[in-house]
Amino acid sequence: MARISGIDLPSNKQLKIALTSIYGIGRTRALEVCNKSSISPSKIAKDLDNDEVNRLRKVIESDYVVEGKLRSEVAMSIKRLMDIACYRGVRHRKGLPLRGQRTKTNARTRKGKRKTVANKKIASK
């Protein structure tokens, strides 16, 4: 089983799909990595030998930001937005959508489960 960037690649999948299990590598980037390391993207991950795994590891670690480092970069950029208190940072802090979506009726994913107000109908009479 190949282990790259602290992630065990799924052994029964094609390399172009198996590489997408690494955070920061999608389909397009997986194909780029395969081309740079001169390995067939349709090769099954369990059929890789140590030389090919080392080439993949070298390409990924030298050219791309993946896994923990990428997660920390994303978290730091969100924290920076919150610290400077720009519009996006304030929306992050409040847990609301950032990009102008309506919030009167939708945005349930971002806002979370409904919080009902007790006796609201009685008070409105």
Swiss-Prot record:
GO cellular component: a single term: small ribosomal subunit
Disordered, as annotated region: 95-125
Molecular function as annotated in GO: rRNA binding; structural constituent of ribosome; tRNA binding
SUPFAM superfamilies: S13-like H2TH domain
InterPro entries, alphabetized: Rbsml_uS13_C, Ribosomal_uS13, Ribosomal_uS13-like_H2TH, Ribosomal_uS13_bac-type, Ribosomal_uS13_CS
Taxonomy, superkingdom: Bacteria
Keywords: Ribonucleoprotein, Ribosomal protein, RNA-binding, rRNA-binding, tRNA-binding
Pfam families tied to this protein: Ribosomal_S13
Gene Ontology BP, a term: translation
Record's function text: Located at the top of the head of the 30S subunit, it contacts several helices of the 16S rRNA. In the 70S ribosome it contacts the 23S rRNA (bridge B1a) and protein L5 of the 50S subunit (bridge B1b), connecting the 2 subunits; these bridges are implicated in subunit movement. Contacts the tRNAs in the A and P-sites.
Subunit note: Part of the 30S ribosomal subunit. Forms a loose heterodimer with protein S19. Forms two bridges to the 50S subunit in the 70S ribosome.
Similarity-based family: Belongs to the universal ribosomal protein uS13 family.
HAMAP family the record matches: Ribosomal_uS13
Listed name of the protein: Small ribosomal subunit protein uS13
Record organism: Borrelia garinii subsp. bavariensis (strain ATCC BAA-2496 / DSM 23469 / PBi) (Borreliella bavariensis)
Organism classification: Bacteria, Pseudomonadati, Spirochaetota, Spirochaetia, Spirochaetales
Gene name, Swiss-Prot/TrEMBL: rpsM
